[in-house]
Amino acid sequence: MIEREKLDKVKHRFQEVESLMADPEVANDPDRMRELGQEHSRLEEVVEAIDRYERLLDERDELEGMIRDESGEMEALAKEELEQLETKLPAVEEDLKQKLIPKDPEEEKNAIVEIRAGAGGDEASLFAGDLFRLYTQYAKQQGWTYELIDASPGTQGGFREVIFAVKGEDVYGTLKYEAGVHRVQRVPETESSGRIHTSAATVAVLPEAEEVDVDINPSDLTIETFKATGPGGQSVNTTDSAVRIKHAPSGVEVSCQDEKSQHKNRSKAMRVLRSRVYEKKREEQQAEREEARRSMVGSGDRSAKIRTYNFPQDRVTDHRLEGGQKNHSLQPIMDGEIDPIIDALRAEEHAEKLANL
């Protein structure tokens, strides 16, 4: 059952927003009015769901009182009505829970995914390649599209680094759970003694920023061109088609050499740069909020290592989950079937947000 105190807070805020919107001083501030209008629209839907939920709770109390106080036909009728009400209540409560959690507008955005080989040399690059395949398979299963932005191949295959964009419905809101350190344990093909090696790759997932999301002044950019290179550093192009862009205020630097056209490389590099600058600003704002929250409730941070792929034991372990949701069969995950993990993490996040309302 949802605490009445939490519901009262939401209703109080709704009344507060309505009062503010009626204030002539606020009405003369278009930005403030737009902001309040959006909040009012969201809260109105929540308050309607609260009213439905509270009506059912009041009806339940009334019926339970009748069952205690009445007998015979009236008692039987009250029991029958209570039974019907109890079947309706869980769905109404779940609907309210979902509406109580503020929707993050970032979740609907497309995403930029960056995979980098970590510790483990060639084996880490091969694993980065496996993760790239995992996510592109998952994208196909979801009906999304993806576009390679930049890649640095590993010397034995895979990637030292690969950056790609994913487009579709709720892409960032789904893939954000994949950000972190992914660890692999397996016997490399080059290992004659059969020893298990541990290596790692990092995954960064950024909401793809639109031009309206972040203001980048062209005078803050330093743009360089150079010849594209392949594995091992050899030049693969006779023209300066590769592009490197640096944003002075943030220190963010992006290079792209995937396309033969300098213009296309520049366009792709700007997409990544815009998203990284946007994400940096979001992280700074989030860090300020988290610092304030930590000072009140203490840190609940998890380890950066989010998942281990254990090939000899045919097992994938997500270290953020517990119980039966923690371990999964390896091959389906490597083939992109990661919905069970993402669904469990999303449910946990929703429960945590609800607890912190």
UniProtKB/Swiss-Prot annotation:
One of its GO terms (cellular component) is cytoplasm. The keyword Disulfide bond does not apply. Methylated by PrmC. Methylation increases the termination efficiency of RF1. It is found in: Cytoplasm. Residues 249-308 are annotated as: Disordered. Keywords: Cytoplasm, Methylation, Protein biosynthesis. It holds the Pfam family RF-1. Residues 276-294 have a biased composition (Basic and acidic residues). Its main location: cytoplasm. GO terms for molecular function: translation release factor activity, codon specific. Transmembrane segments: none annotated. The keyword 4Fe-4S does not apply. The modification N5-methylglutamine is found at Q234. Residues 263-274 have a biased composition (Basic residues). InterPro entries: PCRF, Pep_chain_release_fac_I, Pep_chain_release_fac_I_sf, Prokaryotic/Mito_RF, RF-1. PANTHER family: LD18447P. Peptide chain release factor 1 directs the termination of translation in response to the peptide chain termination codons UAG and UAA. NCBIfam families: prfA, PRK00591.1. Belongs to the prokaryotic/mitochondrial release factor family. This is Peptide chain release factor 1.
